[in-house]
From Swiss-Prot:
The gene is rpmD. SUPFAM superfamilies: Ribosomal protein L30p/L7e (SSF55129). The keyword Metal-binding does not apply. CDD domains: Ribosomal_L30. It holds the Pfam family Ribosomal_L30. One of its GO terms (molecular function) is structural constituent of ribosome. Keywords: Ribonucleoprotein, Ribosomal protein. GO terms for cellular component: cytosolic large ribosomal subunit. This is Large ribosomal subunit protein uL30. InterPro entries: Ribo_uL30_ferredoxin-like_sf (IPR036919), Ribosomal_uL30_bac-type (IPR005996), Ribosomal_uL30_CS (IPR018038), Ribosomal_uL30_ferredoxin-like (IPR016082). Coiled coil: none annotated. One of its GO terms (biological process) is translation.
Length: 59
């Protein structure tokens, strides 16, 4: 079984770079306090690093 992580959006995506909005969409986050469980892969970690100022990660 693959390790999973919980990612929660903590800040709004309004007035952000289009690239960062697309990253949130790729992570499956839609609004503030929305939480998703994702597989812990290098690709997902890279997306989280790109928008780290808008999300919280629980391992």
């Amino acid at each position: 079984m693959a390790k999973t992580i919980k990612v929660t959006q903590t800040r709004s995506s309004i007035a952000r770079l289009p690239k960062h909005k697309a990253t949130l969409k790729g992570l499956g986050l839609r609004h503030i306090r929305h939480t998703v469980e994702l597989e812990d892969t290098p690709a997902v970690r890279g997306m989280i690093n790109q928008v780290s100022y808008m999300v919280k990660v629980e391992e």
